[in-house]
C-alpha cells in the first residue's frame, strides 16, 4: 500500500522502516497553517519504505511511505 500526503504541508513521520502497523494507526502527521492532520494506516502491514524525511515539505499527493504485507 502506498501512503500519500493529503495536502501540502510539513510531514512528521511516527513510524520506522520494519515497524508493524495496524489498521487506523497514526503513521505520520501533515501540518499546514494552523491545521494538523493525521495520516493513518488503511490496514495492517509492515513499513517497507519511508519516502520523505521528517519535517520536509510535501504537496498533496506526494508519496510519504509504503506498507507491505503484515
Region locations from a protein language model:
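Short beta-strand-turn/beta-hairpin segments enriched in glycine/proline and small hydrophobics
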Residues: 1-11, 26-44, 69
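Short histidine-centered loop motifs in beta-beta connectors
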Residues: 5-6, 11-18, 49-53
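A structural signal for short beta-strand/turn segments enriched in small hydrophobics and glycine
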Residues: 18-27, 55-64
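Short, charge-rich amphipathic interface segments used for partner binding and complex assembly
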Residues: 44-51, 56-60
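Short alpha-helical linear motifs
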Residues: 48-49, 66-69
